[in-house]
Amino acid sequence: PKGSFGLFDPEMLMDYCRHGLLPNEKGKGYVLACPPHIEASVYMSSRSNHDIYDAVRSLSLPVLILRAKEPAKDRNAMDFSSSPTWPKLASEFSNGREIYFADKTHFLPMEIPEEITKIIAQEITSAQEA
């Protein structure tokens, strides 16, 4: 597989191909099931929502941030190999923690799905026991 797709766990890549792509209505090939402008709007709206910081600080529930490697200073804007997450985000939550994966990319759940699943399951169990 090309580019970042070569980092995906093989089973995750198959799931992505089965469920993340649709036949191209304009002819041969496939297109993303989530239109690129919709996906981009998720990231762009977070940058323009100035009230988000107050909302984050008001939360008292436990929050765990799973963050991939930081972007290189000279990276291309279309390079998705690093995390778009602010490195100090976890500290903005009153009960925030972070697990940092310095050698993983923005596609963290697709790279190490079993490890991510285990972390999520542990968090759910901890919340239920609290």
Short names for language-model regions:
Residues 64-66, 117, 121:
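Hydrophobic, aliphatic-enriched repeat segments that assemble into extended interaction scaffolds
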Residues 119-130:
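C-terminal alpha-helix
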Residues 6-20:
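Acidic/histidine metal-binding catalytic segments
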Residues 21-92, 97-100:
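Conserved serine/cysteine hydrolase catalytic core
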Residues 98-113, 117:
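Catalytic histidine-centered segment of alpha/beta-hydrolase-like enzymes
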